[in-house]
């Protein structure tokens, strides 16, 4: 079937959602069954049915307590989050806590039901999926969904879960401003490097991202935003203003009447839009409360005054993003407006003044740009080879830390999670026993302290290392992730030039994205155990290193004559005793290793001090050399030689 390769891009917005598809070399933004290219992110429950989109929003005044919107302001948040608590005051529907998670409570077909925000969002996503299917004429399962750039892990994971609940295979979650930048970049077809600032102010969220776009490569330099700022907040200010006016004029408080408030909010939203093109808007609501008609007006100046702090607040993230990107405002080539709220003249003026009167770029449709970019990214991920997208590259991040196993089964991280890819990191390691002929390089991904708790990606042997005492050979290990997320690991022994490498692709052996998120969540739960284990291994390695270093130092030719045979024998025997104790106590507690270390220091320190005063070449080993020390490989499971980290 020729249709299997189609994937859609969905902008799941706070107030409106939008879906697009890339086919025949261009993006189509798909209109819904009402002929609208954006669909309200509303779900309503009635005595007989569930309504989604326009149908839900159209009946909101008659059924305010069972019409749910703003799920995006709840998703991935805790019930006691101050943001949620603040929003509760404005919502006509009821939100309750279910083990700390917010749930929306409604009446549906005469019964009380409660839904998680993910479930509400999944209903909106289902509507977008059906809109695309009606247009394309076949089922759609693959999708790219967008989220605000500063959405945290739980918000992203919850959004992804919503996609799964809607029966979608989420190819990727991408950031809204980045998606908008793709729309801008394709639209412009610009050549040469450009620093672009995306200013995305929507219905409920605000993002600022700075990207460098160069010949189809979109690299995010910095992002900032406000998790809770958008058109809804401007509506709230206007609603509060008119509630006060109604009180003054009619001596009645409509604040507790959900239906009246909802009708007023709808009128305020309409007035706000009118004020973007006119200097005054009128509000006429028949029988708003207790039979009283409410006829009034608001000027643009008054609206701007009501929201002045919110409007000014949009500039802080702009400044922060510029600082993080290490760019001056004069180095930004284009300031691109995205999101319906950027139509507000005052917002535009503040931004323009901040950039010293520069023209703002309004070339892309602010309501559709994000879905447009998501559709392009969906096509790329499905392997679309159209000439205008085949060279397009979005620089993503590595979702999990990558590293290798060092002495004692410790996970030594070379690439931290959330590092932009492509990236390359090199670190030096050494052997852990004398004349060791080879090392086993084992590559892991995960957030745990010990490799046994992480995911083994692959391993290879670097052999042919020239005979040398432990700690002498220098083995350089390089982790290199390319833009496809393909990891190449190479190792080279510096003196002999011997090298070997392995390629690890993001394929069947890797964890699914679900596992990734699960691991990150688990990692926090296990963090305490991890820390204790890391300290235990550090103490063991420190003791072993100290004992070996002392032993080899007193046996050194250069020390002959500077130390009596008796002292030499004392140190040598004590070190041998400790090394033998270590071999039999691989799994001792941190405190036992610390005790052994103190005991060893007590015996050796006076002799070392004497030696010091006599002046000794090469210095004296330190007490706790941290992670530069060797240890036996963890017992069981792992044959093959180990390697250890060098500071």
UniProtKB/Swiss-Prot annotation:
Q: Listed GO cellular component terms?
A: cytoplasm; cytosol; nucleus; plasma membrane
Any keyword Nucleotide-binding? yes
Task: Note the SS bond partners.
Answer: none
Family matches, as Pfam families:
HSP70 (PF00012)
Cite a single GO BP annotation: protein refolding
Entries under Gene3D superfamilies matching the protein: 1.20.1270.10, 3.30.30.30, 3.30.420.40, Actin, Chain A, domain 4, Substrate Binding Domain Of DNAk, Chain A, domain 1
Q: Which GO terms describe its molecular function?
A: ATP binding; ATP hydrolysis activity; ATP-dependent protein folding chaperone; heat shock protein binding; protein folding chaperone
List the keywords (alphabetical): ATP-binding, Nucleotide-binding, Stress response
Region (Disordered): which ranges? 622-647
Stored CDD domains:
ASKHA_NBD_HSP70_HSPA1
- Note the InterPro entries from the entry: ATPase_NBD (IPR043129), Heat_shock_70_CS (IPR018181), HSP70_C_sf (IPR029048), HSP70_peptide-bd_sf (IPR029047), Hsp_70_fam (IPR013126)
Q: Which PANTHER family match?
A: HEAT SHOCK PROTEIN 70KDA
Its family remark reads:
Belongs to the heat shock protein 70 family.
Q: Which NCBIfam families match?
A: PRK00290.1
Protein name per the record: Heat shock 70 kDa protein
């Amino acid at each position: 079937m020729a249709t299997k390769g189609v994937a859609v891009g969905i902008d799941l917005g706070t107030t409106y959602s939008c879906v697009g598809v890339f086919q025949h070399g261009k993006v189509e933004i798909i209109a819904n069954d009402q002929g609208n290219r954006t669909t309200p992110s509303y779900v309503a429950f009635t005595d007989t049915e569930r309504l989604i989109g326009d149908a839900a929003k159209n009946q909101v005044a008659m059924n305010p307590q069972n019409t749910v919107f703003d799920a995006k302001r709840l998703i991935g948040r805790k019930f006691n989050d101050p943001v949620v608590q603040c929003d509760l005051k404005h919502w006509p529907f009821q939100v309750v806590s279910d083990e700390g998670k917010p749930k929306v409570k409604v009446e549906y077909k005469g019964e009380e039901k409660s839904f998680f925000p993910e479930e509400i969002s999944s209903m909106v996503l289902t509507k977008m999926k059906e809109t695309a299917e009606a247009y394309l004429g076949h089922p759609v399962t693959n999708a790219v969904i967008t989220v605000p750039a500063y959405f945290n892990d739980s918000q992203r994971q919850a959004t992804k879960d919503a996609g799964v609940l809607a029966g979608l295979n989420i190819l990727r979650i991408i950031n809204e401003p980045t998606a908008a930048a793709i729309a801008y970049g394709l639209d412009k077809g610009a050549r040469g490097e450009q620093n672009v600032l995306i200013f995305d102010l929507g219905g409920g969220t605000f993002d600022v991202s700075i990207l460098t776009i160069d010949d189809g490569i979109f690299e995010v330099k910095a992002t900032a935003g406000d998790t809770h700022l958008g058109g809804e907040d401007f509506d709230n200010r206007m609603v509060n203003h008119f509630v006060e006016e109604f009180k003054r004029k009619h001596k009645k408080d409509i604040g507790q009447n959900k239906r009246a408030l909802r009708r007023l909010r709808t009128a305020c939203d309409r007035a706000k839009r009118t004020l973007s093109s006119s200097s005054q808007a009128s509000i006429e609501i028949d029988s708003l409360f207790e039979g009283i008609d409410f006829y009034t007006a608001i000027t643009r100046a008054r609206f701007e005054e009501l929201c002045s702090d919110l409007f000014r607040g949009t500039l802080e993230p702009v400044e922060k993003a510029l600082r993080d990107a290490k760019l001056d405002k004069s180095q930004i080539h284009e300031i691109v407006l995205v999101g319906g709220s950027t139509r507000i003249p005052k917002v535009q003026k503040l931004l323009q003044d901040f950039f010293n009167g520069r023209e703002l770029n309004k070339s892309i449709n602010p309501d559709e740009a994000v879905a447009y970019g998501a559709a392009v990214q969906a096509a790329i991920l499905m392997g679309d080879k159209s000439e205008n997208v085949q060279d397009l590259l979005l620089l993503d991040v590595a979702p999990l830390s990558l590293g290798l196993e060092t002495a004692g089964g410790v996970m030594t991280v070379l690439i931290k999670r959330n590092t932009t890819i492509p990236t390359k990191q090199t670190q030096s390691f050494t052997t852990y026993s004398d004349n060791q002929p080879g090392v086993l390089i084992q590559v892991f991904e995960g957030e745990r302290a010990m490799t046994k708790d992480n995911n083994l990606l692959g391993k290879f042997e670097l052999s042919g290392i020239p005979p040398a005492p432990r700690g002498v050979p220098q083995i350089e290990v390089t982790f290199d992730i390319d833009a496809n997320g393909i990891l190449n690991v190479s190792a080279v022994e510096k003196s002999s030039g011997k090298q070997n490498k392995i390629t690890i692709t993001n394929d069947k052996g890797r964890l699914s994205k679900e596992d990734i998120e699960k691991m990150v969540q688990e990692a926090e739960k296990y963090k305490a155990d991890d820390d204790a284990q890391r300290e235990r291994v550090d103490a063991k390695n420190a003791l072993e290193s100290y004992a070996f270093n002392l032993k080899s130092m007193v046996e050194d030719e250069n020390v002959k004559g500077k130390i009596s045979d008796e002292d030499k024998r004392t140190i040598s025997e004590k070190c041998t005793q400790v090394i033998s104790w270590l071999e039999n106590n691989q799994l001792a507690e941190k405190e036992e290793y610390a005790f052994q270390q103190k005991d060893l220091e007590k015996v050796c320190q006076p002799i070392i001090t004497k030696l010091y005063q006599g002046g000794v070449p090469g210095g004296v080993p330190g007490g706790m050399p941290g992670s530069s020390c060797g240890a036996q490989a963890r017992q069981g499971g792992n044959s093959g030689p180990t390697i250890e980290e060098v500071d």
